[in-house]
């Protein structure tokens, strides 16, 4: 779970099957997630890595990397992060990305554009453009990208299922 904050989504994936192990990666110190790991009974199957996913190693030999609402932190360096994910995945591995899906002319989706409007007024380039992730993923070597656009609890977002 890359940039997974409290790690709850990653823990849900790990805990879903007894044969799964996983890594939670974020800037938060391990103490932030250790109680959740313990309460879910996953201490022997979960590793916590702290750091900056843009600057630090993210690990290796993963079958799945979750990158949920973190690609905006890679604006201007998206290929660099996607290459790092590509290199960290096993052959046939999957990178699951959820991002904002802002239209190139910034006219939609309305819920995402309105949420970022104060930042745009301040000249901040926030949000990931539609197809920005999938296009960059192909450029760094991923072989297949499946896209879905869904209304999630955080707004209308793209779900990219990207295969190595």
Labelled PLM ranges:
Residues 54-65:
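A short acidic, Gly/Pro-enriched loop at the edge of an enzyme's catalytic core
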Residues 63-77:
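A short SAM/SAH-binding and catalytic strip from SAM-dependent methyltransferases
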Residues 79-91:
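A short glycine-rich, Lys/Arg-flanked "PGG" loop and its adjoining helix->strand segment in the class I
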Residues 92-100:
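Conserved beta-strand signature within the Rossmann-like core of class I S-adenosyl-L-methionine
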Residues 107-123:
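Short, glycine-/aromatic-enriched active-site segment of Class I SAM-dependent methyltransferases
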Residues 141-164:
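Core SAM-dependent methyltransferase catalytic element
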């Amino acid at each position: 779970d890359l940039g997974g904050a409290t790690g709850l989504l990653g823990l849900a994936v790990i805990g879903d099957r007894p044969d799964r192990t996983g890594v939670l990666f974020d800037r938060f110190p391990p103490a932030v997630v250790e109680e959740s790991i313990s309460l879910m009974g996953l201490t022997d199957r979960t590793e916590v890595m702290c750091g900056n996913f843009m600057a630090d190693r993210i690990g290796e030999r993963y079958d799945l990397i979750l990158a949920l609402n973190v690609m905006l932190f890679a604006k201007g360096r998206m290929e660099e992060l996607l290459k790092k994910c590509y290199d960290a995945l096993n052959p046939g591995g999957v990178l699951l990305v959820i991002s904002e899906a802002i239209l190139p002319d910034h006219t939609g989706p309305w819920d995402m554009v309105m949420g970022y409007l104060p930042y745009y007024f301040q000249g901040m380039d926030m949000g990931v453009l539609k197809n920005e992730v999938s296009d960059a993923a192909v450029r760094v070597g991923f072989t297949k990208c499946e896209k879905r656009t869904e209304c999630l609890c955080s707004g209308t977002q793209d779900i990219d299922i990207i295969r190595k």
